[in-house]
């Protein structure tokens, strides 16, 4: 499982109003955090990636994997206006 450092593939998708932590679906399910993810997060089933909303769900996942560092350690992909993430299906466990 990935453990939340800059080089493990975790990053933020950010737009002018919100942010989502990009997480491999297999890692999310292995962590057990998938049971507590809200409908404010999104999923790309084709890529096997969940986009966990910043206010609660991202923290739920990071806690589940034992992340101790600051959440701003992750790289960001910023989009001016609305992110394409908003067009994905909402997460359901």
Residue ranges of model-derived segments:
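Short N-terminal "domain-start" leader segments
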Residues: 1-27
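Alpha-helical interaction segments
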Residues: 2, 50-51
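Intrinsically disordered, low-complexity boundary segments flanking structured domains
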Residues: 6-10, 36-39, 74-75
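Generic preference for hydrophobic/aromatic residues in regular secondary structure cores
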Residues: 10-12, 21, 41-43, 53, ...
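A short, structured beta-strand/loop element
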Residues: 17-46
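Short, compact, well-ordered microdomains
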Residues: 51-93
